[in-house]
């Protein structure tokens, strides 16, 4: 075979081999793309996204859309060629797998975490909105989680309100920890709880709202968690996580299924305020979308996947987009045409921006582009 032909054949075979490798070789990346948006003032599946009972609510117009991203699963790994194609597209974000799914996390683990973050976000959204409106918000100490196989399993349940430990009233997490750890491992601790309504009514163990004393044996911390720090390893534990649950003078339900994560907090707060404000009509009929976590005091925090959320908002028809200040640098790298990015740090600031949008005085809006 002539040398030239042999060289061309070798080059062709090498190219084919490289193409095969690029198609078959998997790389540790995750792909994000624009997800659906939901109008917090509207309906989803025939039901209001935000429904209020026990208090007057008022008609609204326009849109206050929360935005989402779609993410490939924990087990998915794109081929090298698919990852390269994703890097070249504006509507796909390719990120290291561990940035989205910590090592060892399964789809079920991720779904559970996202659901917990979403529930926490809903709670903070209600709290921040009512504080903004001057409505009193209460709090109570609850069981947040029960460790599988722990002494508390089957005795205490997530959602139970903790009223006292060993007969002494408790109102903080630290008080519960102190009351349990003063025992020697093996000794019982008596929790006075108000069982969560679902368990109390369903099991017939107690009337909803009734107090009951629940004795729970203790074990050493290291018996439940071999990785417990040395200073805690020998302390008595029962295997629960505790936290604070807010209480409200009326019912605010957020009815979205199959949505997770904490990033809708700001938009939920705005939707709640709009529905509770007589004649408020925060948007003035405009299409506003946005994202951002929110804490109980109305502070807005950063989120992931901002570039994909901007595309989702633009495709849905949004004209304005609330953007957490910490996300502005990334967001301004590729702003979709016709979308105005409003820099946002607080719920109060977002409300002031809506007032400017409603009045048409948009030139002074705090913009990410400035």
Question: Across the structure, where does each feature detected by a protein language model lie?
Answer:
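PDZ-domain C-terminal substructure recognizer with occasional recognition of PDZ-binding tails
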Residues: 178-234, 333-359, 364-370
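Short, ordered loop/turn segments at secondary-structure junctions
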Residues: 148, 167, 196, 294, ...
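Glycine- and Gly-Pro-enriched alpha-helical subdomains that act as flexible
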Residues: 262, 275-278, 282, 288, ...
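Hydrophobic membrane-insertion alpha-helices, especially the h-region
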Residues: 5-26
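Terminal peptide-recognition signature
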Residues: 130, 152, 159-162, 191, ...
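PDZ/PDZ-like peptide-tail recognition elements
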Residues: 31-60, 67-73, 91-147, 222-291
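C-terminal soluble interaction/assembly domains
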Residues: 300-323, 332-337, 341-352, 356
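Conserved PDZ fold ligand-binding element
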Residues: 152-174, 194, 310, 317-323
